[in-house]
Amino acid sequence: MTSNDSQPHVAVTGAAGYIGSRVVTEIQEYHPEWTVTALDNFYLGDARTIGETTVEHVDIRNRDRLEATLDGADVVLHLAAISGVDDCEKKADLAYEVNVGGTDNVAWFCRKTGAAMVFPF
């Protein structure tokens, strides 16, 4: 753990989305002592704050910005994705860049730093 009191620092990608915003809310409710970093590119989600957590505008395709934002995270809950069938069909290149390239960036960060990666998809 990165903090002095051994409480985890949890980062959530896709935090402004339907699932991500609920996950952040649950973490805040059941583990208010944890440090939470929330990030999203605001492609579809529009939550700018969740409880007392500000959602940072970060695109997971930008490795440098992602690394700077995730710095210090012990766990990354990777919930960012282009998931709608229509979006994936109409914007196939974007879906690939986010779902494959962006996920690769998150995994790269976790490998580099030793952070755990939770990827439920």
Residues covered by each model-derived region:
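Short alpha-helical oligomerization interface
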Residues: 85-101
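Haloarchaeal acidic low-complexity proteome signature biased toward cell-envelope/secretome components but also
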Residues: 1-8
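Conserved Rossmann-fold cofactor-binding substructure of NAD(P)-dependent oxidoreductases
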Residues: 54-75
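Conserved glycine-rich Rossmann-like NAD(P)H-binding loop of the short-chain dehydrogenase/reductase
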Residues: 32-44
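N-terminal Rossmann NAD(P)H-binding glycine-rich loop of SDR-like oxidoreductase domains
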Residues: 10-30
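Adenine-nucleotide cofactor-binding loop residues
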Residues: 42-43, 61, 83, 101
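Conserved NAD(P)H cofactor-binding loop of Rossmann-fold oxidoreductase domains
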Residues: 80-83, 121
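Conserved Rossmann-fold NAD(P)-dependent oxidoreductase catalytic core, especially the SDR/UDP-sugar
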Residues: 104-121
